[in-house]
Regions:
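Extended substrate-binding grooves/exosites of carbohydrate-active enzymes
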Residues: 1-39, 96-98, 151, 190, ...
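Accessory beta-strand-rich segments of carbohydrate-active enzymes
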Residues: 2-18, 37-38, 52-56, 84-88, ...
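Core domains of carbohydrate- and sulfate-ester-processing enzymes
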Residues: 48-115, 180-212, 310, 387-398, ...
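Extended acidic/polar, glycine-enriched regions
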Residues: 172-175, 235-307, 678-715
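Surface beta-strand/loop "capping" patches
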Residues: 213-240, 595-635, 721-735, 849
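Intrinsically disordered, low-complexity Pro/Gly/Ser/Thr-rich segments with frequent PxxP/GP/PP motifs
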Residues: 260-272, 645-675
Length: 1012
């Protein structure tokens, strides 16, 4: 073997690497713009680009010294660095959540480890005043060996940490050869079991830093914030001591403090009347470290974070983290994430009211945190540790106690892993210690708890007592051991029910409560943002939460014939061990198009809310949910009053003043119309330009219904009370059919089902297939557990049968009285139904359904009718909640209004197709082809869905690009639908959102019409 077996040695994580240090980019002169443009530094030489590459199925196949200078690599392929070799067509993609993709046999990994050999030639020219050269790798998965000009330079692991090598003595003037051997797995892979696609290669930047012999090696900036000043302490470490001038400037370039380092490298400076950094006003100062031959410019923010009386305070104010978990993921580049891609994510997060990010579950590229400093995000920086795999080991006794005991003992509580775990925490802290945006250190994710994490926490708290710590897996412990939690500041939980949170706050509450993951955003969902918001703001000990997660993880494989991107998830690449589409759990699609769940989050976390409004005297109370900004400085508030969806009055509220976390009283007197559904909408727009946000950007809205004499929707009333036409209806029947015929229509009712199988109106065919009573929906990802009960109850195979059909006819029309049931093979009757149809001479159909569910059965997915309308009926007008999909527990981003759309545009195109596109709290809907159509209306609010796809088609296929359109416009009119929730990885749907009624009545009318 060409290389030593460091990759299976827990005592060797690194060989010949430099000690970990803070991140910075030096230059020969002062440069202020290196955060997003570090390539502009004359001391920074980027080695990215086209490299020679050879993939090997096994490390044992690497038999030749490819790293030797002059080795013939003409037979090698060419790849782009940074990159991951799976995206370049080598090896295969694999998505797995918890299970290791290899046997659990630490520290050993499979003998035939796939690996990649990289070779790159580059020019290097030594500078007289910067004669030292340091080779930096910011991200390599999983471990790697390095050679420069054929000479061994070192070894390192920990994929998301920077590895730095002193290669001064290995470089030649002029052309040089850099060679790297990257292994897919190493002993560290047992700590790299993050929920993501597993990818390999050099996935972050590679560069040289040219540096003087005598210069700063490392520095640590800490601050002591007082009422009117801040003491800035710089603790510097030198390669060799050198006098360093230190200047601190405010954002406008004015010098606020300056000094020179003492011999011991320690300097304290005082800044008077400091502006403190926070996510709403990310005010940064510049620190300029000037040495004879080098200048380092860094940016610092002054801020405090502390816990008092079990409450988290930031700059002395109670804080709520409005956070999201973010992975590095792109469908085209994999783990490779550019500054532009990061900026796009941060912009979208700002636009949707996030103020915090958890770097799940590893440190991001170092400039990510500098960008969070600048754009205003509080960050949980998380160590590159997840050892979730031992949780899945085979156990005879599968109790919680044994499960946690076995999970803990394998890695977290095995001293053999102490060095590796502490190393990963130290690499993170040392690199990122000077970033003001980082307010919390996380020891990792889902790795159980034990002595090794106690050591990591103890080191972290000793090194940096000013930040808080969290580690959710501390609760997964061996019950036979008493652990030390003194260095853990928060009680962190993933996906607890609201009742669990209530119980903790009532019975324990010893630490602030953090929802480190909540509201699992998989597919159509989440349906519980508002309820968690209310819980978070109910108790000061709740410091907020981080939604799981930011983006769907998928791999793009070109474009299908229908123009849709072929996104692949777990199992689509032929891998045996995988977790399906569980990686498709983001608030944005892989290309960053927002899900409706992101829109829901945005409006739930709007900066202002209506507390109350006295319609009589016009007195309104608003609450400011901002942590630092007064409303008068942050938002302009506009109002609109609508009548049945049309604006009748609008304007702007004046003099809205409210300090953070307090109320404002304003006056808004409105002339409310006597008739129609009247809604008042407040729209909150950004008053000032902010990082990543333009002035005038809409931050959210409030909507409230106003009282009046007749609050019925006037168009719905017209449909319900339209003048009857005098005429006659001919009734014919046989054993199977009941035929109703009048001047303008012919309706055929199937006597076996009690439902219409054909509808002709004004010479046009309205339906292509028989009407159905519908209790099924294409299961959402959040239905993954309840759907097992639904399928056990055979809801997915239910159909309608009739027992009795009675027909009465009088001068008002035809009355059809029916006794029906919803049944399915092998199970008892699901629903017993009494139904009445009334058909008027003008073709209007009035329906009354009274249904009783067998108590043995689980909650229904939905109940309503399904019609397969003529496909040319593709235009929708409705009054209800829109414009995006809305459900009983997922409608905070929607408002009541009059909306128009094409049917095809109402489809929410989830990558794994599922129930979508419903609209909640509707009064009426009209579906037309431009000339004729059908109206569905009810005295009571209903939900509807109009789609080009059947629910069977949505359930049949695994990917959206496989969908085949129906020959009909599929129209579902629902009395009710079960809530959406977030049960894909969270609690059950809350009781108040369940469709658990055992008896209910549904009244509606169907009215065919011809325009004009």
């Amino acid at each position: 073997m060409l290389v030593p077996r460091f990759y299976e040695d827990l005592n060797v994580m690194h060989d010949k690497t430099m000690p970990a240090r803070t991140y910075y980019i030096p230059a020969s002169v002062r440069m202020n713009d290196l955060v997003e443009h570090r390539e502009r530094s004359d001391r920074f030489q980027l080695l990215n680009g086209e490299w020679k590459f050879q993939y090997y199925n096994s490390i044992y196949d690497v038999t030749e010294s490819f790293y030797e200078k002059g080795y013939d690599v003409s037979g090698f392929d060419q790849v782009t660095v940074p990159g991951v070799w799976q995206m370049d067509g080598y090896d295969t993609h694999q998505y797995t959540n918890i299970r290791y993709p290899f046997p659990f046999d630490p520290p050993y990994v499979p003998q035939d480890i796939p690996c990649g050999a990289y070779v790159h030639n580059f020019e290097y020219h030594r500078e007289e005043k910067a004669s030292k050269a340091f080779l930096n790798f910011e991200g390599v998965d999983s471990c790697f060996y390095v050679w420069v000009n054929g000479a061994y330079a070192g070894y390192s692991q920990v994929p998301h940490a920077t590895s730095e090598f002193d290669v001064t003595d290995l470089l030649n003037e002029g052309e040089n050869t850099l060679a790297v051997l990257v292994l897919k797995w190493c002993d560290g892979s047992y700590l790299e079991d993050q929920d993501k696609f597993r990818m390999s290669g050099i996935f972050r930047d590679v560069y040289l830093l040219k540096r003087p012999e005598t210069t700063i090696r490392d520095y640590y900036i800490t601050t002591d914030v007082e009422k009117d000043s801040v003491v800035v302490k710089l603790d510097m470490h030198f390669a060799e001591p050198v006098e360093t001038k230190v200047t601190i400037e405010d954002k406008y370039g004015a010098v606020v403090a300056r000094g020179k380092t003492a011999a011991n490298g320690v300097l304290e400076l005082t800044v008077l009347n400091p502006v403190l950094w926070n996510a709403e006003n990310p005010y940064l100062y510049q620190v300029i470290l000037t040495m004879p031959d080098e200048v380092i410019v860094d940016r610092i923010g002054f801020r405090t974070i502390e816990i008092k009386d079990k409450v988290v305070y930031f700059n002395g104010e109670k804080i709520k983290f409005r956070g999201v978990n973010r992975h590095d993921s792109d469908p085209e580049t994999g783990f490779v994430i550019s500054i532009q891609q990061i900026k796009k994510d941060l912009m979208l997060m700002k636009q949707h009211n996030f103020n915090a990010i958890r770097s799940s579950h590893y440190p991001n590229a170092p400039y990510f945190y500098q960008m969070c400093d600048e754009y205003g995000f509080m960050v949980i920086d998380e160590a590159d540790i997840e050892a979730h795999g031992p949780f899945m080991l085979y156990r005879k006794e599968d109790t919680d106690q044994n499960r946690f005991h076995r999970w803990n003992e394998k890695i977290a509580d095995d001293p053999a892993w102490e060095k590796a775990i502490v190393d990963r925490v130290q690499l993170m802290v040392q690199r990122d210690k000077n970033r003001p945006s980082i307010v919390m250190w996380s020891m990792g994710n889902e790795s159980a708890y034990g002595c090794n994490f106690e050591k990591a926490l103890a080191w972290t708290k000793k090194f940096d007592p000013d930040r808080i710590t969290q580690y959710e897996s501390a609760r997964y412990r061996n019950y036979d051991i008493t652990y030390d939690y003194d260095n853990l500041d928060l009680y962190s939980r993933m996906y607890p029910s609201l009742q669990e949170i209530e119980d903790y706050l009532k019975n324990d509450g010893s630490k602030p409560f953090l929802l480190v993951e909540y509201c699992h955003s998989m597919g159509n969902g989440p349906g519980d943002f508002e309820d968690y918001f209310q819980m978070i703001h109910k108790d000061d000990r709740m410091c907020g939460g981080f939604v799981w997660e930011w983006c769907d993880h998928a791999i793009a494989h070109g474009t299908a014939e229908n123009g849709k991107t072929r996104y692949y998830y777990g199992g689509d690449h032929g891998e045996t061990i995988h977790d399906g589409n569980f990686c498709m759990d983001g608030l944005v699609y892989p290309d960053r198009t927002p899900h409706t769940g992101l829109l829901e989050y945005k409006n739930v976390y709007r900066p202002v809310r209506i507390v109350s409004y006295d319609q009589e005297n016009g007195q309104m109370v608003l609450h400011n949910y901002m942590d630092f900004d007064d409303l008068k400085d942050y938002v302009d508030i506009f109002y609109e009053m609508t009548q049945d969806g049309l604006t009748v009055e609008k304007g702007k509220l004046a003099n809205v003043v409210a300090s953070p976390h307090s109320d404002a009283e304003v006056e808004l007197k409105l002339q409310v119309p006597n008739t129609g559904k009247i809604y008042l909408k407040l729209i909150y727009r950004l008053k000032k330009e902010m990082p990543l946000l333009e002035q005038g950007y809409e931050l959210g809205f409030d909507e409230m219904k106003l009282a009046n004499e007749d609050d019925r929707n006037r168009q719905a009333v017209k449909w319900l009370e339209q003048e009857k036409v005098i005429g006659t209806i001919a009734v014919k029947e046989n054993d199977k059919q009941l035929v109703l015929q009048a001047k303008d229509f012919t309706y055929v009712l199937d006597k076996r089902t009690g439902l219409f199988e054909d509808m002709q109106f004004a010479g046009r065919s309205y339906i292509n297939h028989p009407m159905e009573l519908n209790i099924w929906r294409a299961p959402t990802d959040n239905d993954m557990y309840i759907k097992l009960e639904w399928e056990k109850a055979h809801y997915d195979a239910a159909y309608t049968r009739a027992y009795r059909i009675e027909v009465l006819q009088n001068k008002h029309g035809v009355l059809i009285m029916e006794h029906l049931a919803v049944v399915a093979d092998t199970v008892q009757k699901i629903l017993d139904v009494e139904m009445t149809w009334k058909i008027n001479e003008d073709g209007k159909i009035e329906a009354v359904i009274e249904a009783v569910k067998d108590k043995e059965f689980p909650d229904l997915p939905r109940f309503g009718i399904r019609m397969f309308l003529n496909k040319k009926m593709d235009e929708i007008t409705y009054f209800g909640m829109g414009p995006q999909e809305s459900y009983r527990d997922k409608h905070q981003a929607s408002c009541h209004g009059l909306f128009r759309s094409k049917v095809a545009q109402m489809h929410e195109d989830y990558i794994r197709p599922q129930e979508n596109g419903s609209h909640y709290d509707c009064d009426y809907v009209e579906i037309t082809n431009g000339q004729c159509g059908i109206a569905a209306v009810s005295k009571n609010p209903f939900s509807f869905n109009a789609s080009v796809y059947t629910q069977e088609e949505l359930e049949r296929v695994s990917h959206n690009y496989e969908l085949k359109e129906s020959d009909s416009t599929v129209f579902c009119m629902d009395y009710a639908m079960n809530g959406i929730g977030s049960n894909s990885c969270g609690p059950d749907v809350m009781d108040k959102y369940r469709f658990d009624e055992e008896a209910f009545q549904f009244q509606f009318e169907l009215i065919p019409f011809v325009k004009g």
